[in-house]
Amino acid sequence: MATDTYGVGYNSNTIEGRYNQYARNRELFLERGRECTQYTIPTLIPEEGHSATSRYYTPFQGIGARGVNNLASKLLLTLLPPNAPFFRFSIDNFILKDMEGDENLKTEIDRGLVEVEKAVMEDIEISSDRVALFECLKHLIVGGNCLLFVSKEGLRVFPLDRYVCKRDPMGNVLEIITKETININVLPENIREVIYKTNKPEDIGDKTCDLYTCVKRIKNKFEVIQEVKGVEIPESAGSYPVDKTPYMALRMIRVDGENYGRSYCEEYLGDLKSLENLTKAIVEGSSASAKTLFLISPNGTTRARALAQSENGAIIEGNASDVSVLQVSKFADFRVAQETMAKIEQRLSYAFLLNASVIRDSERTTAEEVKMTAEELQASLGGIYGILSQEFQLPFVRRKIAILEKGGRLPKLPKNVVRPKIVTGLEALGRGNDRNRLVQFLQTLAGTLGQETIGQYVNVSEAIVRLATADGIEVKGLIKSPEELQAEVEQQQRQQLEMEQAQAVTSAGENIASNIPPKTVGETLKHMQQS
């Protein structure tokens, strides 16, 4: 028996004991997340012991909440774009070499993989995965950590205060323990009997108990077991391959050697705090300045009661110099605070990709400037795309495929032959840079050497395919193949030849007719009719 930082005893041999032990390492990250949520969305990571009747802090500024929701929406549209696949299946290079001589086989395999991609995307479209992922992304932005459970029913989100995890030095997950509060009546009957025998009635309380789920990596599998009141539930035991586990412990920003990640808001916490304090000062100062008070000289002839009870436009006795209005006279101070707020808001707008707030307010702002600003902001998320593609997108696709294969809705794909490849996020940023370089190269070539140089030296078909690929457009059936182009050229040549032959025949007939005398022509026609 050991004791944690709060003086609560725990048994490290039980799942609950290990949870309490790991929770000590999590506390620093949890406190930091709660500090960030105070200036963004206070209900996201509430204080310990909160309930439905808890009162939450209301921030004086709303740019934190607006920025979190905006950034989460942009990440959601990038990670799971609607009506568009975010992954492609790629075939092993050695297998591709074996199929080089058989184009029909390669085409058939590509067609089958496209059907599998459509089936996976259709399952995602009809599910509520995006709703849960949006909540998860907000937790990642504010708290830096979140746990996703992917089942056939959909996604489930575990905030940082409901799970602990342990990683190896490379960042791979070794153990995850979740904590849930459930009604004891949902447990199997044999487990309920053991709990009632091993625990006092007052320990069970209002028939709710904490359910602990342990997910531990053993070699190439994750072993799962659940525990209630120190009693393991045999029916919950199971195992998953490492690459198909339903438990995904996500991080926003990876820090080497730490079990948990850092949040996006933590990097801008100073600006959020400063903006909150300045906004609070200006709001409270403005409220004080808006209060109107009339001062009456105690030695004057004007009566305060007569002034207070008089109606608008009334005539009363008094001296105007006896009456004055109380003013705060803090306009200059408020102006300095307002200018500082504007600079902080602009910095936060860049950080949270609030494009409309960072566009230069000018009549000469061009569409190209707006586009370049948006691309610059999007490129700043390259590191976040990188970690989310490896820790969420790839495991999510593998898990979805495993669920569909187990349900008989997908054929079993050959292992180590066909692999999913992410085509959004960081990959899309790379394709966008390739597109910009290609367009710039073609423009430079045309402007320096002339338009005819492109048609003479550049493979136009390949350039068109690369531009379409960079924009994520499927070229199959859209761009004409070399065979189709060759057939069109041959058809045009045949039509041109037929037109030339027809013109030659017509021209020859006209020449013959023009060289025969009219009388001879008539006789010739008559002879032709008789014959």
Language-model segment annotations:
Residues R34-Y39, V68, D110-K152, Y260-L295, ...:
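Long, contiguous amphipathic alpha-helices that act as assembly "spine/axial" helices in icosahedral shell
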Residues N11, N20, V142, V150-S310:
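Structured, contiguous alpha/beta core segments that scaffold functional sites
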Residues M1-V194:
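Extended, helix-rich architectural segments
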Residues M1-L28, L295-S531:
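C-terminal anchoring/interaction modules
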Residues K74-P82, L269-G285, Q443, E462-T469:
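Short, hydrophobic/amphipathic alpha-helical patches that form generic packing surfaces
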Residues D4-T5, Y57-F60, I91-D110, E117-E125, ...:
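Charged, low-complexity surface segments at secondary-structure and domain boundaries
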Residues N69-L79, R88-I95, E103-K106, I225-P234, ...:
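Short, mixed-charge, low-aromatic patches
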